[in-house]
Amino acid sequence: VDEFDHFIDNNNLSEIAYSDKSYEEIKEAFIQAELTPCLKEKLRNYLEVMKKPLAVRSSGLFEDSLSQPFAGVYSTYLIPNNDADMVRRALELEKAIKLVFSSIFTEGSRAYFRAIGSMIEEEKMAVIIQEVVGNEYDGKYYPNISGVAQSYNFYPFSYIKPEDGFAVLALGLGAYVVGGEKTYRFCPRYPRLHLASIQDMMRASQQYFYAIDLKNKAYNLEHDGEDAAIKAYDLKTIEEDGNLTHCASVYDFMNDNITYDFNVMGARIVNFPNILQYDYIPLASTLDTLLDIFSQA
């Protein structure tokens, strides 16, 4: 968080940041401000070796709070990091960092601080820069699977116990999952237990996915926000990329059942059958072990 303090102090941002100015005004002031020369050099050295898309994430002190949840309060920016010009890549990374710094002062964040009775002046922001997990497919960059898991299930059914936990999976970037879109829900301890009928699975099945658009050179983090470099694609695209085989089934309307034969004409149902039913990768057992460890931590 030292860099955050230097950034605020060196650029005289305290007056506007902690005022009642609009976030747009604060954001513009942050973007026009300068990071320290030392940090700029470190970022350029990092970009010399890191050529994959990057996630620029918040790590505020209050996000470690045990008493108040801060998930989703601050911003995360995904950048393609694929420009041929190193200077432009560095400037884009610097802008993303400044925008994460400024996300403390969004209207939503300030309202949240007021609601929980905390002082926004006490918040300090560090930034985490991570390689985005995934691969490139014809100008798109995304992971095959993303998801979240929780060690306690408030809505168990059948022989599932609350402490067995649950997980939700989706194709593509995790922004789809945390955005509350249609995902596949299962219990890692009992991954073969179907939680819905065929009709319900069809209604609740994922219809599109998110990927970083590597071909878009005109994205604008400042004006388009966290989703500036992200684009939605339909399932046909991911099937053409060859990434649907282990992640979906096909509804055979002639026989009113589910098949794993993609030569059959029918709606694709994203339910990860080869992974959860046949252990193509040990995802369920791995999640079950991790949830057990985390619940005891």
What do these predicted regions represent?
Residues V1-L43, Y112, I120-K124:
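A structural-propensity feature for long, helix-poor, extended segments
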Residues A33-A297:
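Conserved mixed alpha/beta core segments that line enzyme active sites in large multi-domain catalysts
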